[in-house]
Amino acid sequence: METLSFEFPAGQPPKGRALVGCVGSGDLEVLLEPGTPGTLTIQVQTSVNGAEQRWQHLFERIFQEQTPPALNIDIHDFGATPGVVRLRLEQGFEEIGHD
């Protein structure tokens, strides 16, 4: 089990919070909460050791297309594929009202 931390530039914090996914499904869960203006922080707890670079590249691809809101994101991962991670993040952004 590894804990990874990432930080990216962001816009303003949203008003809402969201919880998407389910750890019990062998997938992952993502908790999104308002953060500090201008900063997106992500903490990943993953069952896959040695995957920090893969996570870094995934987040860079997602956030190069859009400026994310200022959030604190906690991800609890149990071997989800990059596509599932992206899907869960997009679901979370939709729930908090960010395009």
Swiss-Prot record:
Q: Which residues are modified to O-(phosphoribosyl dephospho-coenzyme A)serine?
A: 25
Similarity annotation: Belongs to the MdcC family.
What taxonomic classification does the UniProt entry list for its organism? Bacteria, Pseudomonadati, Pseudomonadota, Gammaproteobacteria, Pseudomonadales
InterPro entries for the chain: Mal_deCO2ase/Cit_lyase_ACP, Malonate_deCO2ase_dsu
- What protein name does the entry list? Malonate decarboxylase acyl carrier protein
In the UniProt record, which is one GO cellular component term? cytoplasm
Sum up the protein's function in the record's words: Subunit of malonate decarboxylase, it is an acyl carrier protein to which acetyl and malonyl thioester residues are bound via a 2'-(5''-phosphoribosyl)-3'-dephospho-CoA prosthetic group and turn over during the catalytic mechanism.
Instruction: Give the molecular function GO annotations.
Output: acyl carrier activity
Q: Which domain of life is it from?
A: Bacteria
Q: Give the record's keywords alphabetically.
A: Cytoplasm, Phosphoprotein
List locations, semicolon-separated: Cytoplasm
Which Pfam family would be a valid example here? ACP
Briefly state the modifications made to the protein after translation: Covalently binds the prosthetic group of malonate decarboxylase.
